[in-house]
Swiss-Prot record:
A cellular component annotation (GO) from this entry: cytosol
Keyword annotations of the record: Nucleotide-binding, Phosphoprotein, Transcription, Transcription regulation
Full protein name: Nitrogen regulatory protein P-II
Organism classification: Bacteria, Bacillati, Cyanobacteriota, Cyanophyceae, Nostocales
GO biological process: regulation of nitrogen utilization
Molecular function terms from GO: ATP binding; enzyme regulator activity
Keyword 4Fe-4S: no
Main function: P-II indirectly controls the transcription of the GS gene (glnA). P-II prevents NR-II-catalyzed conversion of NR-I to NR-I-phosphate, the transcriptional activator of glnA. When P-II is phosphorylated, these events are reversed. In nitrogen-limiting conditions, when the ratio of Gln to 2-ketoglutarate decreases, P-II is phosphorylated which allows the deadenylation of glutamine synthetase (GS), thus activating the enzyme.
Membership in a protein family: Belongs to the P(II) protein family.
Stretches of the chain forming a coiled coil according to its record: none
Residues modified to O-UMP-tyrosine: 51
Amino acid sequence: MKKVEAIIRPFKLDEVKIALVNAGIVGMTVSEVRGFGRQKGQTERYRGSEYTVEFLQKLKVEIVVEDNQVDMVVDKIIAAARTGEIGDGKIFISPVEQVVRIRTGEKNTEAV
């Protein structure tokens, strides 16, 4: 199994969720995160003064899937989250050794 973590723009969440649900993904975790990459932040104006927002609001979408679903999930996220502008986000893929459902004790595929 693999964990797919996607850092996306907040306004793209609904499109990403719909694309994944339509592809058969039945669960995901979404967290609010802040960070910066190549875009480094942005300059904003408030009451005539400029200031730099160094950490931009993003969302992290986490999904655990079988190995054979990873490419499909990544493709769906890219298609739904891409704007073509700097700041679209990143996708990280990492191995998952074990999953346990707390309520039932089910493990791995049965727990996802």
